[in-house]
């Protein structure tokens, strides 16, 4: 039977001082002091090393952020250079188009110069033919005059033999000649005054015509400038739309790149953290193994060792959880900072682009308003010149009708000496009365044809405009209203300019024909007085067709109602 004193006693106070309640060594036991100091030194070294690695990771993260910002700035610079190159390309393309248009205009100018030279040569030939005919007529008149001179000389010899009768006849003839000379001098004075007045009126009309042509050229140049500005506005709008589309695509690409970059950075950071965690865990496991082996060698109490190891593992788990939470928080903060920087940069670029576009649109609007005011002023001046020309035409018509009513006075010779006076004194022949000429008819027909061409061109333009509007509406429903509103003013301006140019050209041709008619350059259309009524009826029918055409043009083009009303009033005055 064993001695009870040989068995270990758990109630011994010495054992209680050495071992704890669970059978392990107490933490403040001298045997564990060296182990605890060694563990403390190892933990502090690990903590210092982890802090240094954390600083290195933070520095690497800052450097990566700086490189990313530098890449973003460089990408923005490349985008600016790309935009400048695109603008230069578009400017070069516009220059090439302008050069092509200039070459076409030069070719057209050469063709028109050839036509003008041909027309001038034809007119020179016509003038030469007229001069030749005039010379032949004068030669025939000279021969007739020489024959009359021979007859007069024979009659003079016969009259010398009849002295007494001739003296009485001569006295009566002298009295009648004085009366006729006085009447002739009065008529010649009146004709000279009338010619001077007509010459002054012709000079005034030519001055007004030159002013009208000058204003018309200015108006056409302004119209061309307005068309160019409208084309530039359409082109700028297309560029804005293209830029917006490109900006949207670039934003989508940038968003995708940002997402991919964030995903890549997150994966890289996660991989780095995983590698660091794995490395730390491996080192910790190695340290634990070394520590456990050292503890197992130094102590004999397994329970105390297992308790200390369990506490150490729990402490390490807590440290790992805290470190992971800190890393995740830093990652979230870095992502938020990157998103904030990207958003601020994008907003600043959008603000600058929007400001530039607004300024450009304001400049275009001011330029268009200035051109519209200039066009209105030019139209007012043209209307004023047209009214003045109408007044001068009416004055000239009134003076022409007054000149037709005046006839030269001639005293009838005595019946006894009628045959003698026919042989001795030359008869005064009144000037021919101007009648409707071929130039007037041709000008009227030309005016009618120009009006028909203008209506045809206007219909073609309107049909093309509607077709373009329908096409644009089918292709882009959202921008159909804007396109139609831009196309309608340009079509109306083109049709109004075309009609005004044709009206001015027809008016100029009509004034030139009237001037040639007054100068006696045209022969009468109707030489027989009986056929004047028939020709007058034809002219009335043509005038009625012109009036109907003008009425249709006024209904088809309401923006020309004011000018067409003036033309219709003038036609009504001519009819009256």
From Swiss-Prot:
Keywords for this protein = Cell projection, Cilium, Cilium biogenesis/degradation, Coiled coil, Flagellum, Methylation
Modifications made to the protein after synthesis: Asymmetrically dimethylated at Arg-246 and Arg-523 during flagellum resorption. Probably methylated by PRMT1.
Residues that bear Asymmetric dimethylarginine:
246, 523
Phenotypic effect of disruption: Short and immotile flagella. Inner dynein arm (IDA) and nexin-dynein regulatory complex (N-DRC) components are absent or severely reduced. Radial spokes are attached to doublet microtubules with an irregular periodicity of 32 nm instead of 96 nm.
- Spell out the residue ranges making up region: Disordered: 1-28, 465-500
What residue spans carry the Low complexity bias annotation?
465-497
Q: What is its main location?
A: other
GO BP terms: namely: axoneme assembly
Localization per record: Cell projection, Cilium, Flagellum
| Coiled-coil portions | 33-175, 232-269, 311-397
Taken from the UniProt entry, a GO cellular component term is:
motile cilium
Q: Establish whether keyword Coiled coil is in the entry.
A: yes
Would you identify the family this protein belongs to, as annotated?
Belongs to the CCDC40 family.
Q: What does this protein do?
A: Required for assembly of dynein regulatory complex (DRC) and inner dynein arm complexes, which are responsible for ciliary beat regulation, by acting as a molecular ruler that determines the 96 nanometer (nm) repeat length and arrangements of components in cilia and flagella. Together with CCDC39/FAP59 forms a 96-nm-long complex in flagella.
Q: How does it assemble?
A: Interacts with CCDC39/FAP59.
Protein name in the entry: Coiled-coil domain-containing protein 40 homolog
| Originating species | Chlamydomonas reinhardtii
Gene (UniProt) = CCDC40
